[in-house]
């Protein structure tokens, strides 16, 4: 029964990411973003930013959509401030910026969840697969609140704690993480 509940949480996370992929597909083909790519003019960038805001509002799992034009180095964001310096993107957490070395992840042939963190803040990013021949990149900041809600839905009837962890056992999000942390310290990466 517990395994079934945990499986349901995993399925919900998978559904949430599938919804982000659907937004990504729609956004990649959105005429406003296409025009902003080929006619780097303020009006088209404004229209593209408006569409990104609409897509962000329509999916609560997305906190921010970030669109990067790789030709012009222009950045559009539907929420958090993002800038680029020396090839590194910096994403504002609400108190300071976390570095995101996106180029380290673009050679993958898979979509990726990327956890950025320091001593005081963290962000979970979703970077959909993007071929290196594309002239743009889009990544998504996942809503910490909605991720937490998804994990909380599985925390009833015998499940006292649940968390999403990185491959090196850092907790991305969870409920009652203090009870599970001692077990994570003893896990060996497979």
Residue ranges and their predicted role:
Residues 1-7, 35-40, 79-83, 107-115, ...:
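N-terminal sensory and localization modules of signal-transduction and trafficking proteins
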Residues 146-190:
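Intrinsic low-complexity, intrinsically disordered coil/linker regions enriched in small/polar
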Residues 93-111, 185-190:
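Soluble sensory domains of the PAS superfamily and closely related sensory modules
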Residues 2-101:
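Extracytoplasmic/periplasmic sensory segments of membrane signal-transduction proteins
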Residues 21, 62, 134-136, 154, ...:
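A structure-centric signal for secondary-structure junctions around beta-strands
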Residues 82-84, 131, 178-180:
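Short, surface-exposed beta-strand-loop junctions and turns on beta-sheet-rich folds
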Residues 73, 133, 169-171:
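Residue-level signal for well-ordered, solvent-exposed loop/turn and beta-edge residues enriched
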Residues 90-96, 117-155, 173:
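Conserved beta-strands of PAS-like sensory domains
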């Amino acid at each position: 029964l517990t395994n079934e509940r945990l499986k349901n949480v995993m399925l919900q996370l998978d559904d949430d990411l599938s919804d982000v992929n659907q937004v990504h597909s729609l956004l990649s083909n959105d005429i406003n973003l296409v025009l902003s790519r080929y006619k780097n003019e303020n009006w088209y960038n404004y229209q593209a930013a408006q569409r990104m805001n609409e897509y962000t509002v329509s999916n609560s799992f997305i906190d921010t959509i970030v669109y990067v034009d790789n030709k012009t180095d222009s950045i559009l964001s539907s929420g958090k401030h993002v800038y680029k310096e020396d090839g590194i993107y910096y994403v504002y957490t609400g108190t300071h910026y976390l570095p995101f070395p996106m180029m380290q992840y673009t050679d993958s042939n898979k979509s990726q969840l990327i956890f950025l963190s320091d001593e005081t803040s963290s962000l979970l990013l979703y970077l959909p697969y993007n071929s290196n021949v594309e002239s743009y990149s889009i990544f998504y900041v996942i809503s910490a609140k909605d991720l937490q809600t998804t994990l909380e839905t599985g925390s009833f009837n015998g499940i006292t704690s649940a968390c999403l962890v990185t491959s090196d056992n850092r907790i991305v999000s969870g409920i009652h993480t203090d009870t599970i942390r001692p077990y994570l310290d003893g896990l060996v990466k497979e």
